[in-house]
UniProtKB/Swiss-Prot annotation:
Origin organism lineage: Eukaryota, Viridiplantae, Streptophyta, Embryophyta, Tracheophyta
Reaction(s) catalysed (UniProt annotation): a (2R,3S,4S)-leucoanthocyanidin + 2-oxoglutarate + O2 = a 4-H-anthocyanidin with a 3-hydroxy group + succinate + CO2 + 2 H2O
Transmembrane domains' residue ranges: none
Source organism: Malus domestica
Cofactor note: Binds 1 Fe cation per subunit. Binds 1 ascorbate molecule per subunit.
Pathway listed: Pigment biosynthesis; anthocyanin biosynthesis
Intrachain disulfide bonds: none
The protein, known as: Leucoanthocyanidin dioxygenase
Amino acid sequence: MVSSDSVNSRVETLAGSGISTIPKEYIRPKDELVNIGDIFEQEKNNEGPQVPTIDLKEIESDNEKVRAKCREKLKKAAVDWGVMHLVNHGISDELMDKVRKAGKAFFDLPIEQKEKYANDQASGKIQGYGSKLANNASGQLEWEDYFFHCVYPEDKRDLSIWPQTPADYIEATAEYAKQLRELATKVLKVLSLGLGLDEGRLEKEVGGLEELLLQMKINYYPKCPQPELALGVEAHTDVSALTFILHNMVPGLQLFYEGKWVTAKCVPNSIVMHIGDTLEILSNGKYKSILHRGMVNKEKVRISWAVFCEPPKEKIILKPLPETVSEDEPAMFPPRTFAEHIQHKLFRKSQEALLPK
């Protein structure tokens, strides 16, 4: 039995109710509303800094000079930005379309059907369909619903909570996760070499083939009657090693670069890749975990598929690798497990929320 409370707590329900103003708990504080405008106009803006695009086809070149140049471009993007559009990444347009169609078909189901997959954060069951992944002390809400589940490795998945409708959801999503895992290896090799390490080193440091976990969060941002007052996802950095993002070609991702919010372009057939806190820590700050946020709009539903590549929670101590530390560049981060890092961020965030605005 699906309770009416859970149905009514969904942003999709709220957005479809005909409201012209949003409830106060969705209105962000003034300091968070900087540079919120028409996201479609902002995406067209070609002035100022632009998120770099990396053509990964060159990484497979027979020519070592071409390979080295591509490695250098990727490293530069990781150092300067911590985010990039990957093109020719080896995942077919056909598979990406299948993933997008399957995710959209799930969110197109009646809310009552989606509620069968509802998570229960109070009891620690975070996988499934929900409307708020983390509590913040200010009690503010984000303009999104989501579906969260572990997608790789196979022995860590719980297919019983994956959507059974549409019929090809599991097959498409599982294959996409498998291919993303291969892409993660390819990228981690380049980033290892960029630090002067053996190419397999970073992958080993984040858990290797057995332990690196891929968690998918499908973000569903309904149309919002007052997009200038709300955020789909508030400003944050990812805790992951890497995050790969697919979207439905509706703009919404903004990055905080050189003191300003920059709107990412919608690059056809690309996958957006973020460097997360884990790699920032291991590289002693050489690779950046960039602050970013998700915007909403009045005209179009936005959907994004974020896959977080995360180290095991307790098995590995995250700290700057010895090779990245010197007398001139002392360690910038204390040793913590991945779980401790997450708790530290949540605690810091809750403390900041209690400060007077």
